[in-house]
């Protein structure tokens, strides 16, 4: 007869030796947990600084105690110096601070490290995605370019503002003030102090704007004084600097991603994606997606899928989590570009969803679908296949006909197929 054995342990120990780190800018509290032969845990606390030599001492202490794994909160960028020292020597688990909150009333640095170590010991922490070093370099370049792009937009808006205050209305005639014609006119305004003749306007106008020379001439008749000239020249110099830096970063990224040109080309074939956004996507995800089991896991990580919120058997609001995720912002931009591309599946699907969900939820749904396609392209090497704007119409034709028959019957009519002529 089998003998019943009572197990008094509430949770199984996953990591008998582990460490929790409470990381700050200038100080780290470390709690090392070890387990003796009797299965009893022992705690050792240390506080160290964040200079490289101090972090190296921390690493050597952990290795001397045969610690294979550490956990720390993703506090700003303060975890990066620690990760730089420990990477390649120990397994580093980066956890979301919201997921490992300590018990109220026990909030000290040492207690936080002990709490984190305790959670790690029994496997109650979930690590964040930390890409490889090469991919992290791509990320930093891509995010720097994104910041430059945002700054560029700010400076361009300031140019528009200065022109508006000076009664200069070029942007009412020219769709892009910073296109060839627009820049020519800006340069003309900044270099010509005398009254500008219509002949000089003709020299500035390019393409279809040559037929609007008279309107362009009227648009610059304002109160453009030396004060406005100085401001515009200052702003244009900053715009030129930012554009140069963005071009240098793009070339740098292109060189680093040269081994993955084929993947970038396949990404570029997706509606809404160009060369730059393809680089953004690859820099955020990496070229293998080995850390994501399926497209659903990727969408969840990016904050582009509904959350689970169920209580007492009832499903409550499952809206996407409010998360400032870089990839989510990129995918939303791609989705907007995709739905503006005519005769595509995404455009048709967006307008179908918008009538039911509204524009904001609909665009998130499109971003989710595009991300699933990108998963297949990157991980499985598949090529994008455009379904076309009639895909859903043809797919739902039978059900649509059935609905129309019922509607016609209610109105006292019979729906019959059209006779071929």
Task: Set out the residue ranges of the language-model regions.
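A detector of single, family-specific signature residues
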Residues: 1-421
């Amino acid at each position: 007869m089998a003998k019943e054995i009572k197990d008094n342990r509430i949770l199984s120990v996953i990591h008998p030796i582990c460490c929790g780190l409470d990381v700050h800018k200038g100080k780290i509290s470390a709690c090392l947990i070890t387990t003796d032969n009797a299965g009893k845990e022992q705690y050792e606390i240390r506080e160290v600084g964040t200079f490289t030599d101090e972090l190296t001492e921390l690493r050597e202490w952990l290795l001397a105690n045969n610690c294979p794994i550490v956990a720390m909160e993703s506090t700003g960028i303060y975890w990066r110096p620690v990760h730089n020292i420990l990477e390649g020597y120990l397994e580093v688990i980066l956890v979301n601070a919201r997921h490992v909150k300590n018990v109220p009333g026990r909030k000290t640095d040492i207690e936080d490290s002990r709490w984190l170590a305790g959670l790690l010991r029994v496997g109650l922490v979930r690590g964040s995605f930390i890409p490889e070093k090469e991919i992290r370099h791509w990320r930093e370049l891509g995010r720097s370019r994104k910041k430059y792009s945002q700054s560029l937009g700010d400076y361009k808006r300031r140019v528009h503002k200065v022109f508006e205050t000076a009664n200069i209305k070029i942007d009412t005639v020219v769709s892009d003030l910073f296109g060839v014609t627009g820049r020519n006119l800006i340069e003309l305004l900044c270099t010509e102090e005398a009254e500008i003749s219509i002949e000089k306007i003709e020299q500035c106008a390019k393409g279809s704007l040559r037929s609007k020379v008279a309107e362009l001439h009227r648009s610059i008749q304002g109160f453009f004084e030396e004060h406005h000239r100085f401001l515009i020249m200052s702003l244009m110099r900053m715009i030129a600097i930012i554009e140069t830096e963005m071009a240098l970063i793009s070339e740098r990224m292109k060189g680093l991603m040269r081994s993955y040109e084929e993947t970038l080309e396949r990404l570029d074939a997706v509606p809404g994606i160009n060369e730059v956004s393809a680089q953004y996507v690859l820099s955020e995800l990496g070229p293998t997606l080995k850390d994501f089991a399926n497209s659903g896991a990727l969408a969840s990580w990016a904050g582009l899928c509904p959350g689970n919120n169920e209580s007492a058997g009832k499903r409550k609001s499952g809206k996407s989590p409010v998360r400032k995720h870089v990839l989510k912002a990129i995918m939303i931009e791609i989705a907007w570009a995709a739905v503006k591309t005519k005769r595509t599946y995404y455009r048709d699907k967006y307008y179908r969803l918008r009538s039911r969900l509204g524009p904001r939820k609909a665009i998130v749904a499109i971003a989710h679908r595009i991300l699933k396609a990108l998963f297949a392209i990157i991980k499985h090497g598949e090529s994008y296949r455009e379904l076309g704007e009639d895909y859903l119409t043809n797919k739902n034709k039978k059900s649509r006909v059935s609905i129309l028959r019922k509607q016609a019957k209610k109105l006292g009519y019979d729906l019959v197929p059209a006779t071929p002529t």
